[in-house]
Curated annotation (Swiss-Prot):
Gene3D superfamilies documented for this protein: 1.20.1050.10, Glutaredoxin
Family: Belongs to the GST superfamily. Beta family.
InterPro entries: Glutathione-S-Trfase_C-like, Glutathione-S-Trfase_C_sf, Glutathione_S-Trfase_N, GST_C, Thioredoxin-like_sf
Family matches, as Pfam families: GST_C, GST_N_2
PANTHER family the record matches: GLUTATHIONE S-TRANSFERASE GSTA, GLUTATHIONE S-TRANSFERASE-RELATED
GST N-terminal domain residues: 1-81
Protein name in UniProt: Glutathione S-transferase GST-6.0
GO cellular component: cytoplasm
Cell compartment(s), UniProt: Cytoplasm
Length: 203
């Protein structure tokens, strides 16, 4: 399998999950401005949406959208317990979290990354997004991870989204439970490896 990624983007989430599964895979960097792959290919020919992440399977099939990719990967290695088994209620709570993170947190960043957003509107956007992290912080005051006490695909996604906060001047430092959680997740060997590989931290 091959993961097409851009360093520090939402593709970090499936990158982490891939490493957590122990599956064999390769990665190829994408320049989202030129829409070219690291090897010079036209990225739009691979994913006409022009977005990462993209997972290319060994048979050539293409899977896009991070929430779909992480569930697919987790199901390939059920022994890693990255997502609950089909039909288990726990699984749907995990999917509930993935959907919340995608619709409320991930999308909540969009105006902060856009040059079209009026300066006067930025505080409103930040306050709304901060409120989502306040809720998450409260959840983490009662348990080690977002879906309980063990790492799941939802944690890979939350960790990824939380990394963007400093880049948009969103202050989360007062959320102590969230900060403790992020420090713990960052210490996971597979998370550390993904961060180093993408050049986000030094070895």
């Amino acid at each position: 399998m091959k993961l097409y990624y851009t360093p520090g983007s939402c593709s970090l989430s499936p990158h982490i999950v891939l490493r957590e599964t122990g599956l064999d895979f390769s990665i190829e960097r994408i320049d989202l401005r030129t829409k070219k792959t690291e090897s010079g290919k036209d990225f739009l020919a691979i994913n006409p949406k022009g977005q990462v992440p993209v997972l290319q399977l060994d048979n050539g099939d293409i899977l896009t959208e991070g929430v779909a990719i992480v569930q697919y990967l987790a199901d390939l290695k059920p022994d890693r317990n990255l997502i609950a088994p089909p039909k288990a209620l726990e699984r749907y709570h995990q999917i509930e979290w993935l959907n919340f993170l995608a619709s409320e947190v991930h999308k909540g960043y969009s105006p902060l990354f856009s040059s079209d957003t009026p300066e006067s509107y930025l505080p409103v956007v930040k306050n709304k997004l901060k409120s989502k992290f306040v809720y998450i912080n409260d959840v983490l005051s009662k348990q080690k991870c977002v879906c309980g006490d063990h790492f799941t695909v939802a944690d890979a996604y939350l960790f990824t989204l939380s990394q963007w906060a400093p880049h948009v001047a969103l202050d989360l430092t007062d959320l102590s439970h969230l900060q403790d959680y992020l420090a713990r997740i960052a210490q996971r060997p597979n998370v550390h490896s993904a961060l180093v590989t993408e050049g986000l931290i030094k070895e």
